[in-house]
């Protein structure tokens, strides 16, 4: 039985799980969210596009199924590129970005970058800034990119803000340019300073780690990165990203401070 498990687990991880599309619905009422403001958001996180695991046909299928949900707004939460050795054919970024450009929602499609979208761009790692070629591909496809910026929207006669921060692990240590530690390019304070009224705020942040720094002004923080714990066997997560907090691995998390609800 132990040997069967040792063989079947990798087989499932390589041959089955990457080809499954997991669709999860949440019905939330975040704090400071107006009673009459009904917003249906579709979230796409961590597609890691590459052959054979996430080819263009799968991206096309995800776009089609997302559009079929008829969301009001579509939010893309980063890590569009695989950036690892377990692929036999990287896919040109404009090819998949153009497919994501076919996403359709009345309030549009909006994106942030993830750590792999920075790590896989050697020029961006050297210069310490963007635009990355993956971010540029999204812009070319007509998808606005949120790198420490906020934008106001109106729906059903009520306003809300969408904010997005740049990646918290964007720049790796780099001996050639004497960068000795990880460097994030996120600016939470500067991003939220762009919010000019008391309308509720949705915040896109690729890594969920920042939630403890997010002020109560934000109604809901939306993240990817954790892949539900990477490997999640009945709650056991042996391959969870070391820089992330395990309690933020999956689902809808409500943070509290003492007995007071603090943030979602």
Predicted regions and their residues:
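Membrane-embedded segments
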Residues: 35-144
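Active-site-proximal beta-strand elements of phosphoester/diester hydrolases
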Residues: 38-51, 159-169, 202-205, 259-264
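Binuclear metal-dependent hydrolase catalytic cores centered on His/Asp/Glu-rich metal-binding motifs
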Residues: 121-143, 155-201, 211
């Amino acid at each position: 039985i132990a040997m069967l498990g040792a063989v079947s687990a990798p087989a499932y991880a390589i041959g089955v799980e990457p080809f499954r599309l997991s669709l999860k619905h949440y019905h939330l009422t975040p704090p400071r969210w107006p009673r009459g403001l009904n917003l249906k958001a579709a979230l796409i996180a961590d597609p890691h596009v590459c052959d054979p695991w996430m080819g263009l046909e799968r991206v096309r299928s995800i776009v089609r199924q997302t559009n079929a949900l008829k969301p009001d707004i579509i939010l893309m939460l980063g890590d569009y590129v695989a950036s690892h050795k377990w692929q036999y054919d990287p896919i040109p970024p404009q090819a998949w970005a153009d497919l994501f450009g076919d996403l359709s929602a009345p309030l549009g499609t909006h994106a942030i970058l993830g750590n792999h979208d920075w790590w896989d761009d050697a020029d961006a790692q050297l210069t310490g800034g963007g635009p990355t070629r993956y971010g540029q591909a999204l812009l070319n496809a007509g998808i606005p990119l949120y790198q420490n910026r906020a934008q106001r929207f109106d729906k059903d006669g009520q306003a809300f803000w969408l904010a997005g921060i740049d990646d918290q692990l964007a720049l790796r240590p780099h001996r050639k340019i004497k960068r000795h530690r990880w460097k994030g390019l996120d600016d939470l304070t500067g991003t939220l300073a762009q919010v000019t009224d008391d309308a509720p705020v949705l915040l896109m942040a690729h890594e969920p780690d920042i939630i403890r720094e997010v002020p109560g002004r934000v109604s809901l923080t939306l993240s990817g990165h954790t892949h539900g714990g990477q490997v999640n066997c009945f709650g056991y997560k042996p391959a969870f990203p070391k820089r992330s907090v395990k309690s933020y691995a999956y689902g809808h998390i409500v943070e509290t401070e003492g007995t007071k609800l603090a943030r979602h």
